[in-house]
Amino acid sequence: MRSVRLLPAALGLVTALVLTATACGPTETPAADKPAAGASSSASATDAGTGDGGAGLSKDLADRLKKRGVDLEKWKDGEWKDWDRDTWLREAEDFVNPVIDGLWDPARMQSAKSPDPTITAQAAGGGTDPTPRPVRAQREKTPYHRNAAPVGKIFFDSPQGHMVCSGTIVKDPRRPGRSNLVWTAGHCVHAGKKGGWYRNITFVPAFNDLGKSPSALNNAQPHEVYPYGQYWADWAVTSGEWINRGGTDQAWPYDYAVLHVKPQRGSKSLEETVGAALPVDFSAPAPARAGTIGAWGYPQAAPYNGVIMHRCLDRATRMTTAPATPVMYRIGCTMTAGSSGGGWFRVLPNGKTALVSNTSIGPAGSNGWLAGPQLGRGAKAAHDMVSKKYAG
């Protein structure tokens, strides 16, 4: 009975996501003609989103770096590897992410590991429904740019090494049709209570577009690994709750983040280039009213390999991680770490598909379910903060 009710909604979600891809394929792309969430400054090493080109820093960007004690040349030469707690920038306004040309080559991307946000217990009481049955993750159809264009991988560096998450291109209401916004999890950009902002954050839409195996990807051409290029983040916002308490059970319901990425030199916006972006649903419907939710991402922890996009579809249930904290969505899903930050989508009453959450946590020691935050006023404030900064 459960699967019979799920099927129509599941098919609708998959179909709706496919229909978000309207641009040319990556080889056909024509030439380009601040709340509950904390604000953050950032800067690029060049005027180009990937660092390509010879333009230098603007005075404004250079001043921002100087105020935060960042010497650009020393940073590019390896100073970014210094994770000393006393100098690790962590406050809302401290985010800096200078581009380092050529840093994220295919080999470095392959070596990136996934963070492992898990939880061993839930709060007792009426805020958690029975554990959902596992839903086996399905491989997304290839090429990804035709079937799930808004979905991609986020690469970054942490004290533990090269890391990877998932992310989704979302619409910018102040730049209709020209968004440069990417939605992900807070723990994919900031270490939370015990640390600061991660570094060298870049987004790769439709990573491994043809779904090649890890061994085949080792010999792939760059355009097969990142068909639309790389988009370095030049601004980031996460929730104040995550910055102050991230990594504790009290913070998981606030585990979301918004990135602004800068297009490559002379190119159109991220949305125009990829041809896809999803609206965000900030109505925070109760799990029982959210209906079928689809989660997309690139799971990396065993039994997955991190290079293949997967999806799960299930009806949302309730989960709480600590007393007096907001309820989270939970679905049955066998995706593992690496899918963190990947978008959760639902079909709205008007028939449109919208992002309603992102992958935050899973169970310690197994891979049967995922949980994500409800996106309400705090999440909307974070989204608005980035949108307003880049309006025009």
Write out the residue ranges for each language-model feature:
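Conserved catalytic-core segment of clan PA serine endopeptidases
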Residues: 139-149, 155-158, 170-173, 190, ...
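Catalytic nucleophile loop of clan PA
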Residues: 334-358
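N-terminal low-complexity, Pro/Thr-rich disordered segments
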Residues: 21-144, 392
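Extracellular/periplasmic catalytic domains that process cell-envelope and extracellular macromolecules
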Residues: 145-147, 173-177, 194-197, 249-253, ...
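N-terminal carbohydrate-binding/catalytic regions of secreted carbohydrate-active enzymes
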Residues: 92-206, 214
